[in-house]
Structure formats: structure tokens, C-alpha cells
């Protein structure tokens, strides 16, 4: 039986910041959930309508609703997303490298719950972009239909994760139906908890698109930490898993992980593609160097030129993971100091995206140098020398060029603060009236 939403004064259960994870939904704690509100206040997808684009929409969609919402351009400062390209632009023709953007995000928020999705199409091209958008559509359509059309709302955290896991299968089928390519996918459901003011964050991900929580009291923690071994070196070129036709019609679910944590009102849950997360890794940002690695497949091989690692510390993989989280925190706190306000979901997206855009600027400038594109006669030896100089300059410049996306949600019951303020105002008004009456 699904519990009713209780008044704040009756809430009793509190949870800590621990993260649970496993291959299946049964490997995380079973916690009872409260009733899900159907009152929608935000539904936003991008870029360019994201899951609601014409190539993805199902011909059976209701005229007024696509994947459970009437509009996918209904954003809010508590529910927001951004998607940009960090790649260079041709200085003469204006064409962007890496186009079209193959990342996509979607968020659908109701009064006390939220569905968040992010996908990163593997490699470049139209099929990659289509795969990411199809994944969002298939997953979002399934979750919204199950929860709010068929009224089969999850009674527990395990049931919520089971729904998310099945939504991944729906995402995969949609990709195959539309003949898309491969994509990562991270699916998140923020749920009200029975007899508690806390919320459960249920998450299923495959590939290297990750989920995080920013807490004003506890900093940033990664929810999807169980999907990759933070104690081992990793090849940042390998996503670790993907849905879509990897092997015939089969996906690659090697790192698929079900995760659970609990959050408080005011915390911000955010999902990112690796264009954001990798650009906080101290090795990628050239702040540190990796430990010596004999694995030739690693993309973190130790630099060979002495000046590239002079005065830079050597970091173990786990240290790099912790540093990246702390660096994200620093960027958010600096934004709060600058604005003298608490960071909203929208501002958090803006702050992190602006940081990675600024970080990678020197890399873009190297490739956007007009001199590289002037037509002039060069011997093969001169061309080879020029190309090696560009490679060396790029290796020294911080950051990684990629598509970069983020979607964020500020946890809470939408409208609760306004209702509490209204109650206070009514009480104050009644108090004033009572004093006036006694005075007369």
C-alpha cells in the first residue's frame, strides 16, 4: 500500500548520505515510498526539443502529449538543463567540428517527484544523435505511462528501480526501431519517502554518463559511483557500456548499475555527460599527472616530455575522483560568493558549463588559428612538422573537447514554501486583527 503524503510535523524518518548500488534492483535497500503527485510544473528537453524532435516522436503520440507531457520547453530555475559543444569552429567556413551535437537531456518534474534523463551518443554523426534522443523518448514515455497513465506507481525504492531498469529496455527498442546508433543513458527518479521529509534518488545508468548530488551541508557525491571502478585507471575513450545495436541487436550492459541514495529538500541532483565530468579530472585539466601505467590501452599514459609534468603531483585514480568532486564544489561555491545567493538548479548548470567552456578555450584557439587553413605550398616534411607542433600544443592545453551536457533538479515539494509563507501571513493577519479587537 502506497503511503499518503504526511504533514511536515509528522515526518519522523531521516536518512544519511550513504550510496547503495548493485547490478539489479533487489541489491539495494527496500524503502517505502509516499504517493506521487501528478501536478506537473516543468518538462524540458534539449537540445532542439530533444526527445520531442520530429525524427523521434511516435506517430501514435497523442496530439497534445509526447512521452507524457504537452510541452518539452517548460523550464524552471528548479528544473533545468544545458547542452553545448566544446569543439572548435572552422575560422573560414564557420562549421563546428563534431556537429551535430549527439548529447541530449530531458527532465519532467511534478510537485513531489522528478524524472531525469541524460544520454551521450557514442562517436559523431546523425545516428549517434538519433540514438541519444530515441533513448530519452523510449525511457521517458515508459516511465510516465507506467506511473501516471496506468497508475502503477512504485510502492518502494526497489520497485522504482525495477521500473527504471525496464525503461532502459524500452529505450533500446526505440533506438532499434528508428535505426539509431549507440548511446550511454542515465535514468533518475526522485521519489517522496513515506513518513519522511527526505527523498529517494533511484538511478540506473549504463556507460559514462553519471549522476551527482550537491548538498549544502555535505558537498558533492556521485550517485553512480558503483558503475566504474574509481580505484583503477580508466580509458576515457571507452564509455564502459551502451544501448543500441552494439552486437547485432544487443546492447553492451557491462557496467549497468542500479543506485540509491537519499537527499534533503534544497539539495540539487544533477546528471552529466563525460564532456562535463571528464573536464574536472585533474589529469585532463593538466593540474596533475597519472600514476605510471604499463597498460598501453590506457588513455592516461604518463607524458614523455619533462616540461608537461614539471611541478605537478602524481595522483592515484581515487585521488583524482575526489579532486574532481571537490573542484565541482569549488566552482559552485565561487558562483554563490559572486551572486551572494544559494545556487539554483539553473545556476548550477550555468556555472559548471561555463567552467568547462573556459577551461577548454585554449584548445579551441589552437585549432581555430586561421594560419592553419591558408592555402600555401608545403613539403610533406614541413606539413609533418606543423602537424606534430599542433599535436604537442594540444597535449599541453588543458581540458577535453567534447559535447557537454547537464540536467539538474532542486529537491523539494513544489509550492510548499509558498504555502508555508501564506500560512504565516494568515496567522500574522489574524494576530493583528485580534490585537485591534482587544484594543477597541
Regions found by a protein language model. Name each.
Residues 60-110:
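… and, occasionally, acidic/histidine-rich disordered N-termini of signaling adaptors
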Amino acid at each position: 500500500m502506497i503511503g499518503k503524503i504526511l504533514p511536515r510535523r509528522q515526518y519522523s524518518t531521516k536518512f544519511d548520505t550513504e550510496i547503495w548500488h548493485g547490478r539489479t534492483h533487489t541489491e539495494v535497500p527496500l524503502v517505502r515510498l509516499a504517493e506521487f503527485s501528478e501536478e506537473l510544473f516543468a518538462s524540458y528537453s534539449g537540445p532542439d526539443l530533444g526527445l520531442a524532435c520530429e525524427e523521434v516522436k511516435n506517430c501514435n503520440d497523442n496530439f497534445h502529449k509526447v512521452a507524457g507531457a504537452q510541452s518539452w520547453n517548460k523550464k524552471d530555475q528548479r528544473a533545468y538543463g544545458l547542452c553545448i559543444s566544446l569543439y572548435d569552429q572552422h575560422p573560414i567556413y564557420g562549421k563546428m567540428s563534431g556537429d551535430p551535437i549527439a548529447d541530449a537531456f530531458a527532465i519532467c518534474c511534478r510537485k513531489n517527484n522528478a524524472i531525469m534523463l541524460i544520454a551521450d551518443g557514442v562517436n559523431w554523426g546523425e545516428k549517434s544523435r538519433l540514438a541519444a534522443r530515441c533513448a530519452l523518448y523510449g525511457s521517458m514515455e515508459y516511465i510516465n505511462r507506467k506511473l501516471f497513465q496506468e497508475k502503477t506507481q512504485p510502492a518502494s525504492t526497489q520497485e522504482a528501480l525495477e521500473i527504471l531498469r525496464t525503461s532502459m529496455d524500452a529505450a533500446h527498442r526505440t533506438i532499434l526501431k528508428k535505426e539509431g546508433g549507440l548511446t550511454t543513458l542515465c535514468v533518475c527518479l526522485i521519489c517522496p519517502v513515506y513518513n519522511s521529509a527526505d527523498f529517494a534518488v533511484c538511478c540506473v545508468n549504463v556507460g559514462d554518463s553519471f549522476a551527482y548530488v550537491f548538498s549544502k551541508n555535505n558537498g558533492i557525491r556521485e550517485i553512480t559511483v558503483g558503475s566504474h571502478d574509481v580505484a583503477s585507471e580508466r580509458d576515457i575513450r571507452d564509455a564502459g557500456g551502451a544501448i543500441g545495436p552494439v552486437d547485432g541487436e544487443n546492447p553492451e550492459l557491462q557496467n549497468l548499475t542500479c543506485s540509491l541514495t537519499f537527499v534533503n529538500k534544497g539539495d540539487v541532483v544533477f546528471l552529466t555527460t563525460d564532456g562535463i565530468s571528464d573536464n574536472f579530472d585533474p589529469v585532463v585539466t593538466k593540474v596533475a599527472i597519472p600514476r605510471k601505467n604499463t597498460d598501453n590501452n590506457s588513455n592516461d599514459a604518463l607524458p614523455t616530455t619533462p616540461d608537461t609534468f614539471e611541478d605537478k603531483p602524481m595522483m592515484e585514480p581515487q585521488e583524482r575522483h575526489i579532486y574532481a568532486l571537490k573542484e565541482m564544489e569549488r566552482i559552485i561555491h565561487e558562483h554563490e560568493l559572486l551572486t551572494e545567493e544559494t545556487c539554483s538548479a539553473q545556476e548550477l548548470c550555468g556555472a559548471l558549463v561555463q567552467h568547462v567552456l573556459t577551461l577548454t578555450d585554449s584548445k579551441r584557439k589552437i585549432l581555430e588559428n586561421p594560419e592553419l587553413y591558408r592555402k600555401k605550398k608545403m613539403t610533406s616534411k614541413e606539413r609533418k612538422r606543423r602537424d606534430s607542433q599542433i599535436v604537442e600544443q594540444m597535449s599541453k592545453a588543458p581540458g577535453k573537447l567534447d559535447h557537454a551536457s547537464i540536467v539538474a533538479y532542486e529537491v523539494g515539494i513544489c509550492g510548499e514554501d509558498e504555502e508555508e509563507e501564506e500560512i504565516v501571513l494568515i496567522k500574522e493577519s489574524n494576530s493583528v486583527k485580534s490585537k485591534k479587537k482587544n484594543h477597541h
